[in-house]
Amino acid sequence: MDFNISDSQIKWRSVAREFATKIITPEAIERDRIQLAEDRIPWDWIKLADEAGIRTLGVPKKFGGAEESILTMCIVGEELAAGDLGFAVIMDQCWKMAHLFKDAMTPDQQQKFIPPFVADNQATQLLALQSQKSALTIKDIMMALILE
């Protein structure tokens, strides 16, 4: 088994490291001290991450994404987290949901939901879970997708 990272992973690691060094790190402490959470959301970073291809790293190529592996996204996430963990989590949610959409949606559903996500350079995604039970198991999860 080869434990070396691929050329693509090296490329994306470099992109993420440069992004964290040049974009995130210079502003991270100041942004973290903003009192209101809604003012702290790094919309400018999200746009720049889109320009760099980071935001759509998990989106299938046929929809304009990089369609990278989970391991590649982990490598990129680690580099982003070195700059700001909160921002890395925002990107991670985008990647996680893109893989879920690819794997769990029908082609018609993919066509309805993935292109609008790719087209909006500030679009982010999240997964929220709620259970009526005190303990949540995977069989209890029911999902609905809402396009706003």
Regions found by a protein language model. Give the residues of each.
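Intrinsic disorder at enzyme termini
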Residues: 1-11
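Short, cationic motifs built from Arg/Lys/His that form the positively charged side of catalytic pockets
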Residues: 13, 17, 109-110
